Amino acid sequence: MTETQSLELAKELISRPSVTPDDRDCQKLLAERLHKIGFAAEELHFGDTKNIWLRRGTKAPVVCFAGHTDVVPTGPVEKWDSPPFEPAERDGRLYGRGAADMKTSIACFVTACERFVAKHPNHQGSIALLITSDEEGDALDGTTKVVDVLKARDELIDYCIVGEPTAVDKLGDMIKNGRRGSLSGNLTVKGKQGHIAYPHLAINPVHTFAPALLELTQEVWDEGNEYFPPTSFQISNINGGTGATNVIPGELNVKFNFRFSTESTEAGLKQRVHAILDKHGVQYDLQWSCSGQPFLTQAGKLTDVARAAIAETCGIEAELSTTGGTSDGRFIKAIAQELIELGPSNATIHQINENVRLNDIPKLSAVYEGILARLLAGNAV
């Protein structure tokens, strides 16, 4: 494929060092470009975060692309083979911070819109873009705030494509049609500090917690289902003691996380953890944080359309999957009937020398255009 506009726009976006939550006028660039084909722009800024809602049309169905202009820090610049914010083409790849996550996706959808509108100026429904500069950071003032605004005025989305990098081995081989929930716990087990030679005068929180820890790690939280693997429980950090070898610690701190399927609930998991701790007589404080509920788009119109567009452009059949971490899809699902994630390779995201394959760029744009055509132009491409 010889289309080069997607590559040029991706390079222009990558050249802007938009480390979260700094947008560096990436959204302004998108708004100026899309204004030329009839998109209205609404800036929705909260704190240091810039968000923009771009829409062409007023009717349903609404097909929305969701993405983020912010990127993670580069890490040691000297370890990059080329400056991270100077996009470089070599070895059949485009290098730069944000190349995979996710400035190429944004560029590809914008150019897909340009071609689609040129062919179908009177298309059905509406096209929208929800872009934030706070996805890689705390994600408190980004997509979640925009969703609140849209929800308050009953502005809903029929079909949403989140441009997260999803490809494993080749472009189009995987579509994310859901994500697991993420529930974290910060547990403080209370004991009584004392001299290690006089254990009868102390209470060792490591020892009192050990039986509960064994049960927590061996518990079957659920069996998963057709779309999700079983819920997992993992300890991420555990710390106790003063560093001295002759002191029984007074408390133990344990940080853990659930990645949970739709077979479990936040409330249910909390109740079961408390029950296990209480069963073993553990004295504790426990603080919870849920960063996202599980969501699922069952196989249907959007997944079918995306698979058809991938088959046409890439010649492969896409697999549906719910693996991986959380994304802003967890917020958008509250106002979106159907939602998927579809983008380039995820092999180098957040890494030194992040990159995408050059020949994947026009293909990804063609896939996005194919989705628009099938949803808003009666399958005409």
Swiss-Prot record:
Q: What is this protein called?
A: Succinyl-diaminopimelate desuccinylase
* Family label: Belongs to the peptidase M20A family. DapE subfamily.
Species classification = Bacteria, Pseudomonadati, Pseudomonadota, Betaproteobacteria, Neisseriales
* Subunit: Homodimer.
Q: What's its job? A: Catalyzes the hydrolysis of N-succinyl-L,L-diaminopimelic acid (SDAP), forming succinate and LL-2,6-diaminopimelate (DAP), an intermediate involved in the bacterial biosynthesis of lysine and meso-diaminopimelic acid, an essential component of bacterial cell walls.
**What is the enzyme's class at the highest EC level?**
hydrolase
Identify a single GO molecular function assigned to this protein.
cobalt ion binding
Which residues participate directly in catalysis? D70, E135
Originating species? Neisseria meningitidis serogroup B (strain ATCC BAA-335 / MC58)
Cofactor(s) demanded: Zn(2+); Co(2+)
- What are the UniProt keywords, alphabetically? Amino-acid biosynthesis, Cobalt, Diaminopimelate biosynthesis, Hydrolase, Lysine biosynthesis, Metal-binding, Zinc
Which annotated residues bind Zn(2+) 2?
A: D101, E136, H350
